[in-house]
Amino acid sequence: MRYKPLLLALMLVFSTPAVAAHDAAHNRSAEVKKQTKNKKEQPEAAEGKKEKGKNGAVKDKKTGGKEAAKEGKESKKTAKNRKEAEKEATSRQSARKGREGDKKSKAEHKKAHGKPVSGSKEKNAKTQPENKQGKKEAKGQGNPRKGGKAEKDTVSANKKVRSDKNGKAVKQDKKYREEKNAKTDSDELKAAVAAATNDVENKKALLKQSEGMLLHVSNSLKQLQEERIRQERIRQARGNLASVNRKQREAWDKFQKLNTELNRLKTEVAATKAQISRFVSGNYKNSQPNAVALFLKNAEPGQKNRFLRYTRYVNASNREVVKDLEKQQKALAVQEQKINNELARLKKIQANVQSLLKKQGVTDAAEQTESRRQNAKIAKDARKLLEQKGNEQQLNKLLSNLEKKKAEHRIQDAEAKRKLAEARLAAAEKARKEAAQQKAEARRAEMSNLTAEDRNIQAPSVMGIGSADGFSRMQGRLKKPVDGVPTGLFGQNRSGGDIWKGVFYSTAPATVESIAPGTVSYADELDGYGKVVVVDHGENYISIYAGLSEISVGKGYMVAAGSKIGSSGSLPDGEEGLYLQIRYQGQVLNPSSWIR
């Protein structure tokens, strides 16, 4: 229905020339008929005029004959009167005049009925009035009876001549009119046939034009229908593409959130593992039940109760840490499954987008532009994520290699120490065996007064972890490596979907110092981190300083707490400042719990 006004307009536009052509043909036909009628009427009018002229001439001739007869009667009356007058005067004179009149009348009568000299109808017509006048005079002068008869004969003869002439003229005129009418009818018939032929040709042309116009309108209607269907398909495709773009954007946002949460969980798991490792290592190294037993035996009751409560609290905390680790690992597995599902859904949506783009076939649609922009953004973010993961893996690989080298050195040192210890042990073995029995007897005497609970308790992991000046004893007391503002905290979101696995200090270029004593194990550039310095603080603790503009130390350097190791700069992503990480056995720790 939306194209009905357009169709009516098209039909009106195309039908106007056809109607005009039909009217023109009809007008031409009427004009031809009118001209034919005028041609027919003109000869008839001319014939009418001619016939009227002829009839007038005949009528004039008849009128002239009547007038001549009337004059004859009058002359007859006059002659009679004159005759009576002459009779009254003298009989002789009238007789003599009568004879002379008879002679004269006969001569005139003979002359009047004689052969005409010229034979011209017009001359005879002209002499007729004279003959009539002579006859009148003869009748008046001669014998009145004979003169009247002659006059009547003359009039009758003239009438007959005139009648014959008029009959011939009428016949000729009738024949002429018939021939002319026949010719006129033939011309009219030819004109009518020509007009009819022209009318038929015009109608054929009009019919052909109407058929062409109908075909054109049909094609136009078909094209409009096809265009409407195409536009409807484009509209549906655009709607579908817009919906898919929205789903793709939502899926990508959800994926980024899930990935960020996954990274956060991984970081927490790593920190928890590091904490558990520290506890286990501390318990293994510093497990001294005999010393604790001696302390509990000799301690006052108040000190003993406080120590036991503290020890139970620490052990309970350690158990909670282990439980948290189990929960985090389960959540991590669930999060990884969600991410895998979201990635599969995202790939399916992207395939659907590509299919819709191919089917739609429109290059100037805003939805396609948005889809291409969105795909480009997703690809860019994905590349950034891959780069960050690659950089993280590269850093972990570097630290792993450093740890391997360090372990090799430790093995070598341990082997040397073992050999030295074996030599010393061989020398002191005898003395040690002799003193062993004495020490055992002394311990049995000391343990006789302890309860079973006192004998089973162990020292808490926080007691005696490392040496008194070790890195583990400095937690919460370390100084900031640079004078800056911490803007990227541990576990917070980072641009590109990653999270901070340390602390980022925003600052202009400034001096960077070591947070604790140690040995420089790496000082060079690293992809994704810029210039990097790694300091080994012993006991499997290391600190990492990334984003340096310059490095002031080299591999193998011994540094103290507060020693300058370089100057801050910016990370490859553009963040200006210093990025600090603290790790234990390769697992990240939260620097905020170590820096005061």
From Swiss-Prot:
Residues 25-90, 161-184 have a biased composition (Basic and acidic residues). Residues 1-20 form the signal peptide. Residues 25-184 are annotated as: Disordered. SUPFAM superfamilies: Duplicated hybrid motif. Residues 177-281, 318-454 form a coiled coil. It comes from the Bacteria. Keywords: Coiled coil, Signal. GO terms for molecular function: metalloendopeptidase activity. Belongs to the peptidase M23B family. Present in outer membrane vesicle formulations which are used as vaccines in human. This is Uncharacterized protein NMB1333. It comes from Neisseria meningitidis serogroup B (strain ATCC BAA-335 / MC58).
